[in-house]
Amino acid sequence: METLKKLEEGRSRAEQILNQAYADVNRQHASLEETEFHRLKIQFDIIHFQAFSAMISILKAEPHTFARKVALKEILHMIYEYKGTVTQHHIWRLCQLGEYKGAYDTVTRLRELVRDFRDEFKSLDEYKTLRDKATGHYDQDISVQIAAIERIDEDAALAHALAFAEFQGRFAVLLREIGRATPGT
């Protein structure tokens, strides 16, 4: 249960960070770029908090049970949806903001991060049916929902969650660097 304790501590920190991000996004900013940065950051912090919450639910559920698969489908859905947003919009905008602030090395590493995880993101497409039928977009035929959940491979789902955690950790460092950079330095 040491892992669960660490996740609960991480969730507590993520909650504090999220609440601070909410305060930051609602204050007056010196520029449109700063406002947009805080909006992108709160999106990251929301996902970060949700990921900790989801992992706690997964670990609390008995392994190799239907309940565990239901817990896993939640994080798979979150990762599936977020990967589209982060790769199609957020990374692109953060690169622009980083260039505006002169953080060229960080922008290069941000692009490398996306390249490093391209195959992982592509592999998440296998969860489209799960997403369409049993997570947020529930099929009217309950047996279709159940079948989609039953097909979840726990080991593969946990591997995706761990890869996502690695991506988020590296992304957090780069996000922080862009946030701290100032134009013209």
Identify the function of each model-found stretch.
Residues M1-E126, I146-T185:
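Amphipathic alpha-helical interface segments
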Residues T129-G136:
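Long, charged low-complexity segments
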Residues D139:
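Carbohydrate-active enzymes and regulators
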